[in-house]
């Protein structure tokens, strides 16, 4: 037996969770998997036009190791693993992806993105408008986070028999 702590004032929720656990057990258990995707923070930079936008993207690609070093200096528990970069007119959106080990790490990611953005401003001659430009899509559902990933991804599956559906879950 495995006991799962559940604290709620809603008694019906406890009964519902118990039925779900029984259905999973009666079905032979569940299969689950998880993997770390990374904590993201999406900055936006203002550039003079399309040519400078392309130059900034090239700068980011050519200086990734330096960007990693700048990020690493902000925390021993953080590593810049990759970035996604999208140009839109006079704006370059950069979604930085960090491994923050076992922490959710949003504060670490924000501090690191601020430092990395300052480095980019100084060395690429562009201006960072915001270190949180909604390219990270924090605190709301987004297909971008499903497609590119964010935080931890967890998947679980169980195949429930018709009998268990009918008898335990009272469904047809």
What positions do the PLM features span?
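A structural signal for small-residue-enriched, beta-sheet-centric alpha/beta enzyme cores
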Residues: 35-42, 82-114, 118-172
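Small-residue-rich
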Residues: 1-89, 94
């Amino acid at each position: 037996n495995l006991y799962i702590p559940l604290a709620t004032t809603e008694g019906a929720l406890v009964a519902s969770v118990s039925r779900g656990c029984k259905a999973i057990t009666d079905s032979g258990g569940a299969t689950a998997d998880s993997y770390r995707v990374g904590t993201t923070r999406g900055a936006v930079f203002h550039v003079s036009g399309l040519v400078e936008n392309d130059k900034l993207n090239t700068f980011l690609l050519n200086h990734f190791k330096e960007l990693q070093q700048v990020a690493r200096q902000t925390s021993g528990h953080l590593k810049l693993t990759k970035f996604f970069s999208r140009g839109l007119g006079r704006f370059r959106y950069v979604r930085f992806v960090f491994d923050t080990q076992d922490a959710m790490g949003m504060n670490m990611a924000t501090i690191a993105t601020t430092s990395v953005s300052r480095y980019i401003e100084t060395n690429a001659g562009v201006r960072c408008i915001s270190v949180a430009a909604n390219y990270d899509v924090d605190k709301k559902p987004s297909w971008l986070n499903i497609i590119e990933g964010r935080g931890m991804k967890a998947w679980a599956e169980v195949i429930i028999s018709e009998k268990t559906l009918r008898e335990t879950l009272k469904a047809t």
